[in-house]
Amino acid sequence: MALDKTGTITEGTMKVEDVQLYDTAQTTVVQHTAKFDPETGEPVQNVSALKPEVTVSAEKENGQIQETVNLETVSQEERQKLQEIDHIMGNMMSVLHDQNATADALRKRFPSRNDLKLIHAIPFSSDRKYSGAVFEGRGTYLMGAAQFLFPEGNEELLEHCSSYAQEGYRILVLAHSEQETKGTERPTGLEPLGMFLITDVIREE
């Protein structure tokens, strides 16, 4: 029997509840609910708003956390950034072969695709606490917990992650550097691109 942090019985599986952009220039988060076309990865309705220091309120409905936010039209720039995250993550899922509930949730949200030339993959390890890939002409993409991707500190990002963790989410950060790291070390110039909010799937009674 699997339980979440609150003791609720779960299926032992996870899902990506939301994908959010992180704007390093303005230290803001693009807030939206996770409603996407499974074929194209594009938002199926206007479900995004750009707001500084967004506060999320959550309520329990049928055992699952439902976000209550003010929804506004997603801008073209934000839509392109979300599509780029889908593109990168699809390629990463095709070269990373982790077998666990989190990886399964990511593969379900980001179907594998193989249209970027891989230089080398960076598999997850218990020492590094992150995984990633280096693509030709694109640089390095890493995915993991914020404190391991940015051990030197990124206060604003850590505050955002902490606020979502208090709501019961597990947060993974996608980060990018234009540098092509030669091994498994974090490259210079690493910047956060987005956050994946992951929840346990509640078992139906």
Question: For the regions a protein language model found, what residue spans apply to each?
Answer:
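Short, acidic loop-to-helix structural element flanking the phosphoryl-transfer center
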Residues: 198-205
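Cytosolic catalytic regions of ATP/NTP-dependent phosphoryl-transfer enzymes
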Residues: 1-192, 198
